Amino acid sequence: MLWFKNLMVYRLSRDIELRAEEMEKQLAELTFTPCGSQDMAKTGWVSPMGSHSDALTHTANGQIIICARKEEKILPSPVIKQALEAKIQKLEADQGRKLKKTEKDSLKDEVLHSLLPRAFSRFSQTMMWIDTVNGLIMVDCASAKKAEDTLALLRKTLGSLPVVPLTLENPIELTLTEWVRSGTVAQGFQLLDEAELKAMLEDGGVIRAKKQDLVSDEIAVHIEAGKVVTKLALDWQQRIQFVICDDASIKRLKFCDELRDQNEDIDREDFAQRFDADFILMTGELAALIQSLVEGLGGEAQR
């Protein structure tokens, strides 16, 4: 089981029925296929259990996990530039004239197509967890763009996907700032030793504190000067550590050893059973964390 490292959280904006059996058929229409000789990139669905299963979904207790794979061809700009310049020089020498800009632009496409079959590929996988009980979708990635790209693939697969980023009633940065200023956090949480503070002004400064007591005069000075906390490292129930950001994304998830070892009694050779047990454990813990965090930050914005 690949334990999630990050969470970009989205709310289903209206009630839709997402059933694993139906989704399995829909995902099969867009399974991942490798890039052809002239493809720059390809994206599609693969089994969340990797080579251990052909199933494109895995479900338990109303939780569904799916996995998108992307292949991108790597063509460094200097390589393209060098090949293009060589081609331009040869043509200009052969024809005894300078090429026009439109001709050079056309040549660039030719050069790209000639280089593509020899380009290296970069592969990436993005896990997505659908909580049908609470109407949430979580994407295991650190960037909003990557999350939106993965959601776009799912939207294309299903035909529609009404989701919006999870939004809270109160500005997150103001709540986080008050937690650091007062040293008092929501029940079940504990301040760790890392934060980022930003000035409210457009071109204001940024302070990144690491391995530092956040409830200190030094940090208080920055808050008094008008900076707000935009990232904050927290511990939840001594079970999960993470960084909460002002866009409600959760980064650098770290599960305690006791939690990760909870299913050690299951034979590792039985991959499917261990995957299922870890998936149930992880989603149960993260669903509880998200609920506690949303409540602690003042509740979800009314839709």
Swiss-Prot record:
Pfam families: RdgC. Keywords: Cytoplasm, DNA recombination. GO terms for biological process: DNA recombination; regulation of DNA recombination. One of its GO terms (cellular component) is bacterial nucleoid. GO terms for molecular function: double-stranded DNA binding. May be involved in recombination. Belongs to the RdgC family. This is Recombination-associated protein RdgC. It comes from Klebsiella pneumoniae subsp. pneumoniae (strain ATCC 700721 / MGH 78578). The lineage of its organism: Bacteria, Pseudomonadati, Pseudomonadota, Gammaproteobacteria, Enterobacterales. The gene is rdgC.
